Regions:
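Glycine-rich, proline-tolerant flexible connector loops at the mouths of alpha/beta enzymes
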Residues: 40-65, 73-82, 103-118
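Conserved small/polar residues in nucleotide/adenosyl-binding loops
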Residues: 133-135
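Non-cysteine beta-strand/loop elements that form the S-adenosyl-L-methionine
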Residues: 8-9, 98-107, 127
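Short, acidic/polar
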Residues: 23-34, 85-92
Length: 135
């Protein structure tokens, strides 16, 4: 039985965070086309709502004809004490209209305690609520 390996590329988001790296919208669209030409399955375009360039990218990439790649939007769980349906960043993920959405949730106790300032159970509830509100 043959298994297919699918490639999920994060160059446009994670790669853009490198020191001295500042991809323009045109750069991101050119890289998208090149990754698609190479047969990459998923291209993570950025974090809609985190900056104007990523919002522009998700609008502009809709006009790019891709052969195989599916565009993914990246984001996090909603903020504590905010209904997921009312969370700005989750709303921007939905509005981006990407083929795929990649949502991360904090897993390390230190991050849950110090960054989110919620209990572990509350954090798990926040992660579960995303599916109920937006999937």
């Amino acid at each position: 039985m043959r298994k297919k390996i699918e490639i999920y590329d994060t160059t446009l988001r994670d790669g853009n965070q490198g020191e001295g790296v500042n991809l323009s919208l045109a750069d991101k669209l050119d890289i998208t086309a090149a990754l698609d030409d190479m047969g990459v399955d998923f291209i993570e375009g950025g974090w809609p709502g985190s900056n104007p360039k990523d919002i522009e990218y998700f609008q502009a990439v809709k006009d790019v004809e891709l052969r195989t790649a599916r565009i993914s939007a990246f984001g996090s769980t909603h903020r504590a004490n905010i209904d997921p349906a009312d969370d700005f960043f989750l709303t921007k993920l939905v509005e981006a209209g990407a083929d795929v959405t990649c949502i991360f949730g904090k897993a390390w106790d230190l991050h849950v305690d110090e960054a989110l300032r919620v209990t572990g159970d509350t954090n798990l509830d926040m992660i579960a609520e995303i599916g109920r509100a937006h999937v």
